[in-house]
């Protein structure tokens, strides 16, 4: 199974002078900047060309339920000519909340978009029934790094189960596209490659630029499963002037201050 990890295009929070969960000016569920919109159009064109080159290839597109990812995944799905399926567990660390983590007062949690709201605003997307009332429990406020690592670990288990099912013929073979977030992708890759997963200062990071594409191969072999990187942080579809994100310092702060934009 081939897995394509796509980070969302530049969000309004990404463009803040000081992006992070500690910034009171952050939005709980931001949209995209003009640069981000240009990035999604570049993604759409890239995947449209890929579809034209391999018209018989089967693909699946999965998306985080956060607005910046839905805007990005809609372009990915349009380019590939398929519908987008939404999974609540693909959201970014922190969840859906307003206010600054570590500021005065506790963060105020929100439910996030409901199934009806998502499918009305993003007609190409299909949201599951368990999102009838949203995807985030407001009582949780802001998700911790430890909780995010546990959640992403279960996503990794899901990906391996899909790879095995495709290998065994229990599920149609397809290339899997997941549109998610910078810190989510870092945690996922660390889990896949058995890198140390800690809180606070990190010894290593997998940094993703906005609207980048990673490609991995999940191999189910008789002597055991193996996953390998084939493409890392590909942004060749983006003109230099519209590239953004992916700094080491930015992702490092996401751990040391518990949160990213």
Language model region names:
Residues 1-3, 92-120, 165-174, 190-261:
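Acidic, low-complexity terminal tails and accessory targeting/binding regions
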Residues 1-58, 74-81, 220-261:
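An N-terminal RHG(E/S)-centered segment typical of histidine phosphatases
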Residues 11-18, 94-96, 128-130:
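Short acidic/His/Gly/Ser-rich catalytic and metal-binding motifs that mark active-site loops
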Residues 41-128, 206:
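Phosphate-coordination/substrate-recognition cap region in phosphate-metabolizing enzymes
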Residues 50-57, 159-175:
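Glycine-rich phosphate-binding loop signature in dinucleotide/nucleotide-binding domains
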Residues 63-64, 150, 179-180:
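Short beta-strand scaffold positions
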């Amino acid at each position: 199974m081939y897995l394509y990890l796509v980070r969302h295009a530049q969000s309004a929070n990404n463009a803040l002078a000081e992006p992070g969960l500690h910034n009171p000016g952050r939005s709980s569920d931001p949209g995209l900047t003009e640069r981000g919109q240009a990035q999604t159009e570049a993604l759409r064109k890239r995947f449209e060309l890929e579809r034209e080159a391999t018209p018989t290839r089967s693909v699946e597109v999965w998306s985080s339920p956060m607005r910046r990812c839905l805007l990005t995944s809609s372009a990915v799905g349009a380019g590939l000519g398929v519908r987008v399926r939404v999974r609540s567990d693909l959201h970014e660390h922190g969840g859906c909340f307003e206010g600054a983590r570590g500021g005065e007062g506790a963060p105020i949690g929100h439910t996030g978009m409901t199934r009806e709201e998502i499918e009305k605003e993003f007609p190409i997307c299909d949201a599951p029934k368990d999102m009838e009332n949203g995807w985030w429990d407001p009582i949780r406020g802001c998700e911790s790094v430890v909780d995010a690592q546990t959640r992403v670990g279960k996503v990794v288990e899901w990906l391996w189960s899909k790879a095995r099912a495709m290998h065994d013929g229990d599920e149609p073979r397809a290339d899997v596209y997941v549109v998610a977030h910078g810190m989510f992708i870092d945690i996922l890759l660390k889990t896949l490659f058995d890198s140390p997963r800690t809180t606070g200062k990190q010894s290593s990071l997998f940094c993703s630029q906005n609207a980048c594409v990673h490609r991995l191969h999940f191999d189910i072999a008789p002597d055991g499963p193996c996953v390998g990187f084939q493409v890392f942080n590909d942004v060749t579809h983006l003109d230099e002037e519209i590239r953004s994100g992916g700094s080491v310092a930015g992702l490092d702060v996401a751990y040391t201050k518990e949160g990213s934009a």
